[in-house]
From Swiss-Prot:
Transmembrane segments: 4-24, 29-49
Keywords (A to Z) from UniProt: Cell membrane, Membrane, Transmembrane, Transmembrane helix
Membrane-topology annotation of the record: Multi-pass membrane protein
Identification of the protein by name: UPF0391 membrane protein Avin_10980
Residue ranges that the Swiss-Prot or TrEMBL entry lists as coiled coil: none
Keyword set includes Transmembrane helix: yes
């Protein structure tokens, strides 16, 4: 599960860079939402991955 979380974090960072950089101006809102969502998922899986 931690592997998937890292993959999603990388995808969210790429989407964020494209959205915030002006390359895909219309996708900025979606990139912000995806970045926040996958960042939260990454932190949650990081915490539960260490305890389990």
């Amino acid at each position: 599960m931690l592997t998937w979380s890292i993959i999603f974090l990388v995808v969210a960072i790429i989407a964020g860079l494209l959205g915030f950089g002006g390359i895909a101006g219309t996708a900025t809102g979606i990139a912000k939402i995806l970045f926040a969502l996958f960042l939260i998922l990454f932190v949650v899986s990081l915490l539960f991955g260490r305890t389990g």
